[in-house]
Each structure stands twice: as C-alpha cells, then as structure tokens.
C-alpha cells in the first residue's frame, strides 16, 4: 500500500511540475508591454499618401508617394499625424488595424511643428482611440513605447527610454521645432506620425524624425504632446494655427557684424507693417539704406535685444517668444534707438492669414 501511495504522490508532483512549467510566464515589464500593445494598437493607422501622375495622353495614374503612421484620438475619426506624411497629397488612404481602408480628409496642418489632422468616416467600433498625457511631467530615463509602421511593417511595437528632453530640430520648412523629446526606442522610416507612449499607454509625443537616412541608430525624436494639445484646437476649427506676430521684418545683426558693422547683438527692424503690433507700440523700421562694401544695408531702425528679459538674436528666438503666445497677450520689448536703451509694452495681435 505504501509504495503505491508514494508512487501516486510522486506522479501528482510530476504532473503539477509539468503543468507549471508548461505555462509561459512573463516578467512584469513584458506583461506591461503586452497590455499596452493590446489596448493601443487598434488606434494606430497606416496613412498612404497618393500622388497623381499623368501619362503621355494626360490620363491620371495614381501612385503612392509615401506612407506613414497616425493615431485616432476620438470616435469622430480624428487622426493625428506628421505634416510631412500628408504633404502635397492628392489622395489619402487610411488603413485601420482590421485592414479596412478609408479615404482620409486633411482637416488642418501646421508645417512649423510638423503636425497635421486627418479625418475618416469609419464605424466607431472599427478602431480604438488614444489619450494624451502632459509631456511637462516626463523625465529622462522613463520607459517609452513607439507604435508605427516602419518600412511598411504594420503594427510594430518598439520600446526604449527617454534619452533627453528639450532638443531642437528643423522642420521641413526650415523652422526650428523646440522642446523635442529624444528617445532610443527604434524609430524608422514609416514610423513618422505614430504615438510615443508612456507606461500607462498614454501619448506623450508624436514620432517625427530620426538621425540618419538609413534608419534608426538609437536616436529618434518626437514632438511633445503639450505642443499638439496647444495647437490641435486651432487645426480642428480653422485648419491652421493662428499665431500672433509683431509685424516686423527683422535682420539678425550677426549678419551685419560679419560684414564689418559694429552693432549690438539683436534684431534690426528693417520694416514695420502698418497697423501691426510693433507699429501700434511705436517701434521704428529702417529710415535709410547705407552701402557697406558691396552690400546695401537697411539702417536707422530700432534694434530689439530682449523680449520679457529674454535675449533675442535670431528669427528662432523671436518666434519662440512671440508665436507661442496668444493674441491679446502683452510682452515687454527692450530695444536700442540712437544708442540708447528703451522698453515698450506691446500687445500682440494675430498674424493675417495672407
């Protein structure tokens, strides 16, 4: 009896051991990745940019000129992506995670921040949505996940960390995008416009660029979510971002110093637009043109050196201090006129659409 009993217990233990080890176990980190992918992937889409070419007989020949990623943010079919993904598109085709395809309509675009909004008319139950988190709360070293369609390989998940904050990169139109998130999560061509997620599965950035044309080398960039949250209302309502301006044509004095002119660092006002903020505040543009060597230089205008105590010496400095504000806000402009330092309070107005 005892041998039989011992044999029975032995077989039970072997069976339990086999069952336990036959079940795949995942680490806490792996479980988190799996959960985020399961919850988020239905909100991520592929966007094909279809251009139209014409043959010898002027017959239209559609051709895919590029593709990228986007993600849905509500059940009205609103998709966030990069501007360069949809730029110059004759037709947009959006592919959902269930492989269904829908025509996309460009709702709004902001080339300065490389962001755009596309809308589809698909059944709400056919896709998921993602929520934004505030990028002001993120820190270097925290875990991030990138979802996208690199090289056309749809629904690809990569992981990494935030490598740095506050980077500056150039948009395709040459304007500087500031406050950029740097990550080592693998980002490749086709990932553009996809979400950069935190460990709760919320969007903290929009993947936009990599270093090197051949693909990821461990350095990718994302536009922070707070930038998107700031401009999305304008894109949805107006189709573009309404930005304030001073209404001046400035010349960075660094260029004048290079040709031998002894001048304070700042922005020389070449011209003031009638009725604009600078004009209303009494700022003055150039009163004459002087010749320096073979160059003709506007001269006699005020030289702006600071805005709200922040030095400004380039077009990017000026844009950062003015265009990130709202119409009606007031700023203090410090400037030099006839070798004397002055200050004036300027109330900002919107830049005309034209």
Residue ranges and their predicted role:
Residues 273-276, 305:
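Nucleotide-binding motor/catalytic cores of P-loop/tubulin-like NTPases across gene-expression machines
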Residues 79-80, 280-315:
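Conserved PDZ fold ligand-binding element
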Residues 22-265, 271-274, 315, 319, ...:
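Serine-dependent protease modules
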Residues 9-18:
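Bacterial N-terminal signal peptides
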Residues 1-8:
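Bacterial N-terminal signal peptides that target proteins for export
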